[in-house]
Amino acid sequence: MTTMMGRVNSAESFTVALRSFAPDVVLSDTTLAQLDSFAALEILRAVRPTAPFIIVTGAPTGAQTVAAIRAGAENLILRAYLSGLVSSISDALAIRRPLHSLTERQLQVLKLVVEGYRTRDIADRLGVSVKTVESHRGQVMKRLRVHDVVHLVRYAIRVGLIPSTF
């Protein structure tokens, strides 16, 4: 495993860094003036939807914590407790590891399934046959070790592919 650290100060430089370096995990400090963590998380989900996002913060309110988790952050780590950062990163990567084994097409099918599209609609949207969509969905479920669409959606919420509405 290669470790790389970088610092960005704008949405543009963050997007370039994501595309150039394809990080396995992103840490965001809430004190960044020009790029807040929620904007960074939104960019991350568009560019690298499977990468875990962990926010480092001073003293979040309950509402900020709930908003971060709903937006798809894996965790919020208090600066006073940075000793938990390594285990938080390890946990986030372990949960998402099966997701990294999916092909780009399987990831597309997964997103459309959990967004509620029917098989026929997914096939039309992707320009493939219904059988191809069923095959991709079956492979996704096998790799993620889920047995039905309900558990597929729960997994997608847990890893931040879709926001949780509690």
Which functions belong to the PLM regions below?
Residues 118-151:
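Recognition helix of helix-turn-helix DNA-binding domains
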Residues 38-50:
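Short amphipathic alpha-helix used as the core "switch/output" element in two-component signaling
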